[in-house]
């Protein structure tokens, strides 16, 4: 077997050569003394289909021809270098023998005859046609052995030490398994070929010579013993498959479809760039990272279907394997050779091999994103408990189901508590100056500022236009009498004196009429949050939105109860033929067949290896042919046959309990940065800033014209009001008055653009699982499923006990060969094989419709405090407050500078 596999690539199969005795002959052969030499001789003549018989006819002419042909046929075979020469004999344990030999030999094994040329008597020595196949080791020879000496190795001392290819050992019939073609009564056994020359064996060497050529056809031999039953023929055509089984019960509903709806705001016409909002990009990034988790776990395995109906009877089974050889029958009359039979048909392919063991578990993957909890499935009916099956191998990932429909929008949750005020944001960059506003109406007069320090004297201004004459001042008191001066020239006008102290503040005038409305002031800070208004009327139903992106898969819902058992489906179409099954184990031994007719003469077998020198015995006298010996003891149990084909698939076991939750996976990769959050609430109002510094004093007015001398007159009437002077520069800002009353609420402005999306909040805790729904009605009968694959073939039954030995039959007359009998009726159906392993998990069923919406979950926990919002837009300026009360009079100012000299007084009265 080894040699065939490793040294002869053209070998068809492991050659089933049986044992050949190569040991020195002893009185008893124990089973371990029978050695096996598995050699592949490489020539087409010696295939395993021939059986070799010994019927020597000695004719002188063929000896020379035998020697000449040997060298030609086997020139390329170099026996000196073959590796099997050094192989030690092994004990017989190969798979080639149907029954290992355990019988005890009752006489010395005949390893060869003396083939010297003196023994050329041409009498026909008829040996029994004994098949030497290792099964029947009682070598009782019916013929006359007296004229044959056992071979003695006398000549090896005289021969040269390097034997040549022309020197061959004694021919021992090669022992091969008797196959069907040589025992079915269609070939007569031929005669034995001529003897070869004696072999030359050096001490300690085994040299194998090539086989000689075939001898001439001998006379017709006597009919052989009943041969053993042949090996089984190729299996017949495969029977039609049985009717398909009933469809299985409905599987559990699939996991709910994805329900994640992400609102996306697409850019309008005026947006720059691609119309992908930051929110959508963020969702895409999240979904890409969660793409692994989008495929839900495969659904649980469906319940086992009911067994299918019993199939019809199959076609006739394959022929059984070779049986044990029957007892030796009486010697039959030599029959004429029959015609050669036709070769049998090729058998059908064997069934599929068994399913392999599941592979090692792969490395643990990263933890997927937590899915949303699934809706609980409807509870089915409880199924009958099946027998515990072996755990099936993990199924392949199912195809991802189609997206479910978008569920109805949930009710709005309750408003959360108001968030804390965020920290004040950093001041933004200084904006560009706005367009100058329209001048507002003059504000109310501010409180009097403190007296500023006198400014430096301004440059002399151009003289102003002549003012209107002022009102006459009051008459001054008479001055002291001055000395009589000469009238002097009119002096140059003096410089302006400093302004006098400001007068006391007059009383406030009446309130003026309402001025035109001023420009809108800056927007005020938003007021506190109002009380939640009453619910408005429910709006009209909106149009159906676009399909949202896939949500994360939900948690696996609780397992529903088993559904009602469906009705029996229609019988499915016939399935395709299954693959070829493996060859079954050997069947029990058949009854011994009738004696076959004598076959044709077989080809000359390969000469065996030369035996060891036997002990020289005295030549015995010719004895009478003995009776057939009794059967030997029952042989030891044979080597286990090849494993039978895999049994039929057993019923599916119950579903295992739910496994423990796996460990939390590593955190996923960091998500992309979220968009800006919505603006936070405005910060608290800051404290009032300090009062600004006092403004600089205005420029000095132009000097008035010099007054004329004269007595002061009586005060005249009040002159007309002068023209209004140009508006002076604005004075310093007054102190901020108290806040005026809130103006009436203006009309609601247009809705602003929506703010940028806030960052995604942390995932809330999963809501409580919904209550279990009520049990649904059984669904309509489903369409019959596709045919499952053919089940695996059951294990073969145990081998039957060997039958009792029949009595030897009487010698029958030679009958003509009968026509072949009709095909036997099919045997009874065998018992069902043991349950096969659990089949592969079925394909995932279609995604069920979305279940009813669960009850509203409890409000989630309060989320973490959001980031501080941006500063709000400045509110509108409030209406101007009412004028404040008049301030207290200011402190007296510093003393003014000395005025210019007055005009000269009028001349006093003369006393």
Curated annotation (Swiss-Prot):
GO molecular function: extracellular matrix structural constituent conferring tensile strength; heparin binding
Any single Gene Ontology cellular-component annotation: extracellular region
Region Nonhelical region, annotated ranges: 1-186
Region spans: Triple-helical region: 296-911
Main subcellular localisation: secreted
Residue ranges of domain Collagen-like in the record: 209-257, 296-353, 749-807, 806-864, 851-909
Compositionally biased residues, Gly residues: 308-317, 350-359
Region feature Short nonhelical segment, mapped onto this chain: 276-278
Region (Disordered): 1-31, 73-130, 155-282, 295-911
Positions of the UniProt region annotated as Telopeptide: 279-295
Start-end of Basic and acidic residues biased regions: 574-583
Similarity section: Belongs to the fibrillar collagen family.
Oligomer status and interactors: Trimers composed of three different chains: alpha 1(XI), alpha 2(XI), and alpha 3(XI). Alpha 3(XI) is a post-translational modification of alpha 1(II). Alpha 1(V) can also be found instead of alpha 3(XI)=1(II).
Function: May play an important role in fibrillogenesis by controlling lateral growth of collagen II fibrils.
Name of the protein this chain belongs to: Collagen alpha-1(XI) chain
Organism of provenance: Bos taurus
Gene: COL11A1
